[in-house]
Amino acid sequence: SGEQTIYENIAVQNTQVNAGDLILVNDANAYVDNNASEIVSIYDKKTEHYHVSGTETSLRETAVDALNRMLEDFYVAKNHSDIIVISGYRTKDQQQKLYDEDLAQTGESTSTRVALPGHSEHESGYSLDVSLYEDGVQSDYDGTGDYSWIDENCDHYGYILRYAADKAEITGIQAEPWHYRYVGEPHATYMKENNLCLEEYLTQLKDYTSDNRLQIVNWDGEIYEVYYVAADMAADSTYVLVPPDQDYTISGNNSDGFIITVDTGRIQSFEENSTAETTASEGQTVPEETQAETAAAPEENSEEAVG
């Protein structure tokens, strides 16, 4: 039956609550991380089958890499190369400018169309807006027709349609078919399959612990385990249980805790259910050969996960 997966405690700085692929940025949760070291120009890294509005339009490097794969596959599937990224990463000052311009246009005291400065997902570098651009003419992107391929498949690349019409009451943002958010795999697939927006998903994850992990079968059959650890706000850092012999990442939720995502190295067999909860007794046994395949130096993992 193999050996038990051993968990060990590592200390994670509480400032990391505000960083990672799964952070929630909305009216209630300001973006405070302000680490722009991973922000890169999309233009410098993009593939040939989409456009970008300017050389300064930027995203986090992981989000650009995923975007490149997605839009290359979209081109292969549908033979369209007219998507243009019109907005990515914004500084707080740029967001303030957009906000002020909207108020000037509407004459209102608050905006329903532009997020408050400090509260826009764009400031995190994980979000982008797209339009269509052909023969010098830009037109609105609505995600219909051939372009529905993107909503149907974006989870394969770690992206979600962030502001769906049926979630407006929860997100506080009206439908934006052009706004995509990178959350990473396997989270995008789980959210899509269970029709959850990011707010709902992060709330649900609080039900899972290192003893009672959420098992997610990714779109490609790879099995992940996900759980939540509340931040110890009385201290500067929080002890988080992680499996040192497996690949894992740690993301803050931007409010009060950490989400640990473990790549078990296992692939779903056909008779297994698509999603299941894993308890400590059933889930902590991993075949020895699987452990060997996914083993990595704990020090490397620990640094990578929280850096």
Model features per residue range: what roles?
Residues 1-88, 92-307:
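Extracytoplasmic cell-surface/polysaccharide-interacting catalytic and binding patches
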